[in-house]
Amino acid sequence: MDQTLSEFGNVFVFFLLGVVFVAGGYLTARMLRPSRPNPVKTSTYECGEEAVGSAWVKFNIRFYVVALIFIIFDVEVVFLFPWATVFRQLGSFALVEALVFAGILILGLVYAWVKGDLDWVRPTPSVPKMPEMPASKSSSQRD
């Protein structure tokens, strides 16, 4: 029990020293830097150009979908890398497990592909127009 508390105590002291070091750096910088604000310094800097429009721009949802799919497959690599390093010791059961894992992710990719989430430009659905019916004869023309 004492050994565990001692290890957590070391981690806590290390964390506390890190916080003190960062806070000390901020306080030292605040005391030493000159403070001369003016409108040019407080304006928005955008690659040397004047800022145009609002910063609250709506991004296309396709960016998020592509990023999410990338993260999913990036995490897959993170999970498969340790498996690949000890593949020979694990045997055929581990191979089957890895293939099932990769298969599930490939099914997810196929689903996203079929659904159209990977298409950058989606075709707009078109509604067929109803053909115009010829004008019916009025009752006076029938007589």
Swiss-Prot record:
GO CC list: NADH dehydrogenase complex; plasma membrane
Top-rank taxon: Bacteria
Primary localisation category: membrane
Compartments it resides in: Cell inner membrane
A GO molecular-function annotation: NADH:ubiquinone reductase (non-electrogenic) activity
Topological relation to the membrane, as annotated: Multi-pass membrane protein
Reactions mediated catalytically: a quinone + NADH + 5 H(+)(in) = a quinol + NAD(+) + 4 H(+)(out)
Function: NDH-1 shuttles electrons from NADH, via FMN and iron-sulfur (Fe-S) centers, to quinones in the respiratory chain. The immediate electron acceptor for the enzyme in this species is believed to be a menaquinone. Couples the redox reaction to proton translocation (for every two electrons transferred, four hydrogen ions are translocated across the cytoplasmic membrane), and thus conserves the redox energy in a proton gradient.
Family: Belongs to the complex I subunit 3 family.
Keyword NAD: yes
Subunit structure: NDH-1 is composed of 14 different subunits. Subunits NuoA, H, J, K, L, M, N constitute the membrane sector of the complex.
The species this protein was found in: Chlorobium phaeovibrioides (strain DSM 265 / 1930)
Record keywords, A-Z: Cell inner membrane, Cell membrane, Membrane, NAD, Quinone, Translocase, Transmembrane, Transmembrane helix, Transport
Protein's name according to its UniProt entry: NADH-quinone oxidoreductase subunit A
Entry's transmembrane regions: 8-28, 63-83, 93-113
EC number: 7.1.1.-
